[in-house]
């Protein structure tokens, strides 16, 4: 279930459970490893960098780091400041409670930040802290206007669009009367939604503000992952561009049609920049595939019926750029850069020649080009697109860049970067006119003290042919103390999404280096359905979950077993989460005894149940196509339901570990429980690790360590 927020996922997953606070000031770990091998405890000892902001003069950078205590089972966000060359690093945080979302104000004289649900400010040296807001409702995000006279405040409001409010005389009643869809989202019941408020900044502080969406039952930013990046100030501080999907109930659950709106703070008038004023959306049948409905007709595609998010004004104020997907209901459609000319209303898509996703971007200082991050062949690099649509790749290498911004000198960019052997760190990029030649200098070394104690597995890349004659790339991760003369147990890694790239990602759970440290070779294929290999490759999977993508998995592991002498073909396992978990459940009935064990995390097991269980109904509508009860199913829908993993349990013959979070409303926990129960009824060795308090991810430190220990205990039991 690929989202626009791919680049921010690691930071989000690492910080979401930091809300619970204690008086213990959790800081940088001084853990000493007992061996040169990575452990679960070492993973949780790592600082997690994010939220970097360069000062207006480009000379300093403020950023935040998340630290965790396994003992306390909590995390803590800390603010740091440093020179833009990486020198003079200083910790600004003094509280045991989170201080986050730092930004520069007053021309760089002060730093604003969030603390205990309010906006505060301080000097760049951390002195003279001052509370700026006194909101009765927690502030969850903010953004000052360029002139410093106004501020956007993100607050949550009660919402009863899908869940009725209980009678006032039953204050202890816990039941929820649901009247429409969108009553649950990701990991929570939808009983509040976020709204943006525009407040004035005065000498006496910040006013309460005006709700941009007053009396409108819509959220902004978009749940569950959207943040302040979905709103932007105009250069003259008079307008705000914001992202919103103005739908409720079934319409919300079935549609990905978010738009960019322009709000004038003086007149309080709002204009939809994506659609004409007289636009009327074609009727949608939620039980039929959106692929062939009128909403996705060639004529209606001119009205931006897909995702439109993350607006950014050009420095000269003439344009607004945003990320845009063409089709409604297709959350993994190609992310393009749309440039809107404010004077004429003309929209231009400037990355059409780049046949992959744009994941983040920033304007160049001349307003004539845009820097963007894009995935290609398993790596996320920096590109530049002119307003005329000319695209050039600036950086190259086996890594993933993320969260890019231009420094005020117009000559350097600040970005995060990570790879399979390094967690995210900050880099300064110096663009070069020559293709793939831009220099990137590392300026933070947050976890060097831990890396210096570890031996990491080598990363390699290999290409092989698929069953239909295409070229398939897969990553190979070798064991930490690799001996080419030995044979090793080997894991086939099945990616989720189903359209998320197997890039040079770093995960604090699905971490390839901890697999290497435990003596496993990892085979990680960029199978059919993944971005970075062209639209045809990416889109082939929709409606064909059990076809060519599964053949690609088997092509990769068969190639490795046949041609890599260190791969022990008699000790193979398959592991994966989400769509990767679905893949494991399917392969369990179709692997012809290749594998000796399986691990499936939060995977779909019964696709008929999944069609109506998942809360984002657009996903199953697009991927499975028609509702399973329809008598005139499309051919893809028929194949999808006929090949659901639960229909092949009679062919299961291999030990399987099922893992699931009970707060996972994307793929409900009954999917994992059903798979485990089926295996045990058939007498197959199986275990179920269930987390009552985790969602699609595992976010709490002790749960994370339990996950890792269970994961490797299971693999070691059957593969060593």
Language model regions located:
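N-terminal cap/lid segment of alpha/beta-hydrolase-fold proteins
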Residues: 445-485
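The serine-hydrolase catalytic nucleophile loop
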Residues: 487, 498-512, 527, 670-671
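Predominantly five- to eight-bladed beta-propeller fold
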Residues: 22-27, 76-77, 153-215, 243-246, ...
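Short beta-strand element of the alpha/beta-hydrolase
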Residues: 478, 486-496
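Conserved beta-propeller blade repeats
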Residues: 46-61, 96-112, 129, 136-151, ...
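Short loop/turn segments that connect beta-strands within beta-propeller blades
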Residues: 83-87, 123-127, 201-204, 264-268, ...
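Active-site-proximal cap/loop segments of hydrolase catalytic domains
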Residues: 511, 516, 524-720
């Amino acid at each position: 279930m690929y989202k626009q927020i791919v680049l921010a996922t690691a930071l989000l997953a690492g910080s979401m459970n930091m809300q619970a606070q204690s008086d213990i000031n959790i800081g940088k770990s001084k853990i000493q490893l007992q061996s040169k091998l990575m452990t679960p405890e070492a993973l949780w000892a790592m600082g997690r960098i994010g939220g970097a902001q360069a000062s207006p003069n480009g000379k300093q950078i403020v950023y935040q780091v998340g630290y965790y205590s396994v003992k306390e089972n909590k995390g803590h966000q800390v603010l740091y400041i440093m020179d833009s060359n990486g020198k003079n690093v200083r910790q600004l945080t003094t509280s045991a409670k989170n201080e986050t979302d730092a930004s520069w104000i007053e021309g760089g004289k002060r730093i604003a930040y969030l603390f205990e649900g309010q906006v505060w400010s301080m000097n760049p040296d951390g002195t003279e802290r001052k509370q700026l807001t006194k909101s009765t409702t927690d502030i969850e995000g903010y953004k000052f206007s360029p002139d410093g006279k106004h501020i956007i405040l993100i607050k949550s409001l009660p919402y009863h669009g899908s869940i009725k409010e209980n009678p006032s005389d039953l204050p202890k009643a816990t039941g929820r009367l649901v009247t429409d869809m969108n009553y649950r989202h990701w990991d929570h019941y939808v009983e509040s939604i976020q709204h943006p408020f525009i407040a004035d900044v005065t000498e006496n502080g910040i006013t309460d503000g005006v709700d941009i969406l007053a009396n409108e039952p819509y959220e902004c930013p978009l749940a569950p992952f959207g943040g302040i990046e979905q709103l932007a100030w105009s250069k003259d501080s008079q307008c705000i561009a914001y992202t919103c999907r103005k739908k409720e109930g079934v319409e919300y659950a079935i549609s990905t049609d978010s738009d960019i709106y322009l709000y004038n703070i003086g007149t309080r008038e709002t204009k939809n920049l994506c659609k004409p004023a007289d636009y009327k959306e074609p009727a949608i049948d939620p039980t039929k595939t959106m692929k062939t409905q009128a909403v996705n007709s060639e004529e209606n595609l001119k009205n931006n019926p897909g995702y439109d998010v993350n607006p950014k004004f050009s420095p000269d104020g003439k344009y607004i750029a945003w990320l845009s997907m063409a089709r409604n209901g297709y959350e993994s459609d190609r992310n393009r850069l749309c440039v809107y000319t404010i004077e004429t209303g003309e929209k231009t898509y400037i990355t059409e020649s780049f046949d992959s996703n744009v994941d983040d971007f920033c304007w160049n200082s001349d307003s004539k080009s845009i820097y963007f991050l894009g995935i290609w062949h398993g790596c996320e690099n920096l590109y530049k697109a002119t307003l005329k649509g000319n695209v050039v790749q600036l950086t190259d290498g086996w890594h993933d860049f993320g969260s890019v911004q231009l420094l005020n000198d117009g000559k350097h960019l600040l970005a995060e970067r990570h790879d399979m052997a390094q967690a995210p760190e900050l880099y300064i990029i110096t663009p070069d006119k020559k293709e793939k030649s831009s220099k990137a200098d590392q300026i933070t070394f947050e976890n060097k003290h831990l890396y210096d104690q570890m031996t990491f597995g080598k990363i390699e890349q290999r290409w092989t042919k698929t069953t239909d004659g295409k070229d398939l790339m897969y990553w190979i991760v070798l064991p930490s103390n690799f001996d080419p003369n030995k044979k090793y147990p080997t894991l086939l890694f099945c990616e989720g999404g189903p359209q998320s790239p197997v890039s040079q990602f770093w995960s604090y759970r699905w971490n390839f280096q901890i697999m290497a440290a435990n003596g496993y070779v990892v085979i990680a294929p960029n199978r059919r359905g993944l971005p970075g290999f062209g639209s045809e490759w990416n889109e082939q999977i929709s409606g064909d979950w059990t076809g060519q993508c599964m053949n690609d998995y088997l092509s990769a592991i068969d190639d490795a077993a046949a041609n890599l002498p260190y791969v022990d073909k008699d000790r193979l396992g398959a592991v994966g989460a989400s769509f990767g978990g679905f893949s494991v459940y399917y392969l369990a009935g179709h692997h012809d005894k290749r594998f000796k064990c399986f691990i499936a995390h939060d995977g779909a097991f019964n696709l008929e149940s999944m069609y109506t269980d998942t809360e984002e109904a657009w996903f199953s509508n697009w991927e499975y196509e028609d509702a399973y009860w329809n008598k005139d199913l499309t051919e893809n829908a028929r194949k999808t339901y006929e090949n659901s993993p639960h229909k092949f349990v009679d062919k299961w013959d291999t030990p399987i570990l099922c893992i699931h979070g009970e707060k996972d409303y994307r793929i409900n926990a009954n999917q994992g429980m059903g798979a485990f129960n089926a295996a045990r009824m058939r007498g197959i060795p199986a275990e179920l690790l269930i987390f009552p308090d985790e969602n699609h991810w595992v976010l709490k430190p002790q749960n994370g360590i339990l996950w890792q220990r269970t994961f490797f205990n299971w693999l070691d039991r059957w593969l060593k």
